[in-house]
């Protein structure tokens, strides 16, 4: 069993600084760094993946469009959508990228089935679907065995912005959400359902759960930890030189 830290961000988070925080964490983590999962909701934003094609953005309007370094095509993030950013050491977990994606899909589908929603993954396209409607999108990046980015689960949101794009590069793809099947639905209830399943399916111990009131605190925490490790290295180096 491995350890994991779960961070729940308490406010709507803009995409750009969160993306930069993921990159910083991933670039500076080491083999002994504890895995983290970040739960949050974003301010409205379209994100274009590495494989993204301009023709799939039909009309972004006043919503920002950010080209990012995850896999996949264009999608939408906004309030009422649960983001789970998975900052994991796949080598330590013994997972290939393909198995990692399938485990995410199966875990999300299993959590939705607990709400009576007949969700499942598809062999032909990443994500989780209810019939032919997409309820959860997955976009990842793996660098040196470390994953970042993650999944977007539609809970109770305004789905209208999805009509401004071809979601995930599929023309005519219909998006759905938990609220269409379970109403009312609370975000915290969804988290309480999905967290234990992630722990079980990925082999994690009971997590340390931290509620963050600002992204700045999150970034500062990682930078401080990195600085402390550098200080320890300098102390060891100096002692050897002396």
Curated annotation (Swiss-Prot):
Q: What is its main location?
A: cytoplasm
Query: InterPro entries of this UniProt entry?
Result: aa-tRNA-synth_II/BPL/LPL, BPL_LPL_catalytic, Octanoyltransferase, Octanoyltransferase_CS
GO cellular component terms, A-Z: cytoplasm
Protein name according to UniProt? Octanoyltransferase
**Family label:** Belongs to the LipB family.
Q: Name one GO molecular function term.
A: lipoyl(octanoyl) transferase activity
Q: Keywords of this protein's UniProt record, alphabetized? A: Acyltransferase, Cytoplasm, Transferase
Extra information? In the reaction, the free carboxyl group of octanoic acid is attached via an amide linkage to the epsilon-amino group of a specific lysine residue of lipoyl domains of lipoate-dependent enzymes.
Q: What are the disulfide bonds?
A: none
| BPL/LPL catalytic domain span | 31-206
Q: Which organism is this protein's natural source?
A: Coxiella burnetii (strain RSA 493 / Nine Mile phase I)
Q: Per the UniProt entry, what is one GO biological process?
A: protein modification process
Annotated residues for binding of substrate:
70-77, 137-139, 150-152
């Amino acid at each position: 069993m491995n350890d994991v830290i779960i961070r729940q961000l308490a406010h709507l988070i803009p995409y750009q600084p969160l993306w930069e925080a993921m990159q910083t964490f991933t670039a500076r983590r080491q083999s002994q760094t504890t895995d983290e999962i970040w739960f949050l909701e974003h301010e409205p934003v379209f994100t274009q993946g590495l494989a993204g094609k301009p023709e799939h953005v039909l009309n972004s309007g006043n919503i920002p469009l950010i080209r990012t370094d995850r896999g996949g095509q264009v999608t939408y993030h906004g309030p009422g959508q649960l983001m789970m950013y998975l900052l994991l050491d796949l080598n330590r977990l013994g997972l290939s990228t393909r198995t990692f994606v399938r485990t995410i899909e199966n875990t999300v589908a299993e959590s939705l089935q607990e709400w009576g929603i007949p969700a499942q993954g598809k062999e032909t396209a990443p994500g989780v679907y209810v019939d032919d409607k997409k309820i959860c999108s997955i976009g990842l990046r793996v660098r040196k065995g470390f994953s970042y980015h993650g999944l977007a689960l539609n809970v109770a949101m305004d789905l209208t912005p999805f009509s401004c794009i071809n979601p995930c590069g599929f023309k005519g793809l219909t998006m759905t959400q938990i609220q269409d099947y379970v109403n009312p639905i609370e975000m915290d209830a969804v988290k309480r359902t999905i967290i234990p399943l992630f722990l079980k399916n990925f082999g994690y111990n009971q997590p340390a759960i931290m509620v963050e009131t600002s992204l700045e605190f999150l970034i500062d925490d990682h930078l401080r930890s990195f600085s402390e490790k550098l200080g320890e290295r300098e102390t060891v180096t100096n002692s050897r030189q002396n």
